[in-house]
């Protein structure tokens, strides 16, 4: 189970001086390279070649996109204190369709609340 998932609110704890301390939602998790794309963090300019589409309109130019950052440089935001926190797990017994199942739940270490 991943500690950081798509849609989580995270804070940047290290890296670029301009991005450090910023909070944003995780847009994408790249599990193969241990990186995440965070909304509004590490914005880079991408130069795209001018090309023609099927309808005849031209695309291309300079666009600003979010680049991935390493997962160790972000920390989950505690839903109660709104500060960065580590993530732990708690196992719970849940009954589904008449059968008992063991489920792992993510827990904020700072407040002990479910994430």
UniProtKB/Swiss-Prot annotation:
The gene is rplX. Gene3D superfamilies: 2.30.30.30. GO terms for molecular function: rRNA binding; structural constituent of ribosome. PANTHER family: MITOCHONDRIAL RIBOSOMAL PROTEIN L24 (PTHR12903). This is Large ribosomal subunit protein uL24. One of two assembly initiator proteins, it binds directly to the 5'-end of the 23S rRNA, where it nucleates assembly of the 50S subunit. One of the proteins that surrounds the polypeptide exit tunnel on the outside of the subunit. GO terms for biological process: translation. Keywords: Ribonucleoprotein, Ribosomal protein, RNA-binding, rRNA-binding. Pfam families: ribosomal_L24 (PF17136). It comes from the Bacteria. Signal peptide: none annotated. It comes from Beutenbergia cavernae (strain ATCC BAA-8 / DSM 12333 / CCUG 43141 / JCM 11478 / NBRC 16432 / NCIMB 13614 / HKI 0122). Belongs to the universal ribosomal protein uL24 family. GO terms for cellular component: ribonucleoprotein complex; ribosome. Part of the 50S ribosomal subunit.
């Amino acid at each position: 189970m991943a500690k950081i998932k798509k849609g989580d609110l995270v804070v940047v704890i290290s890296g670029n001086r301009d991005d450090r301390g910023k909070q944003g939602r995780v847009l994408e998790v790249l599990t193969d390279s241990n990186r995440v794309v965070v909304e509004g963090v590490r914005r880079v300019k991408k130069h795209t070649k001018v090309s023609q589409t099927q309808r005849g309109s031209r695309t291309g130019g300079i666009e600003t996109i979010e680049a991935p950052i390493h997962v160790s440089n972000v920390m989950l935001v505690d839903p109660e204190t709104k500060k960065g926190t580590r993530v732990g797990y708690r196992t719970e017994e849940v009954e589904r369709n008449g059968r008992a199942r063991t489920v792992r739940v993510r827990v904020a270490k700072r407040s002990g609340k479910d994430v």
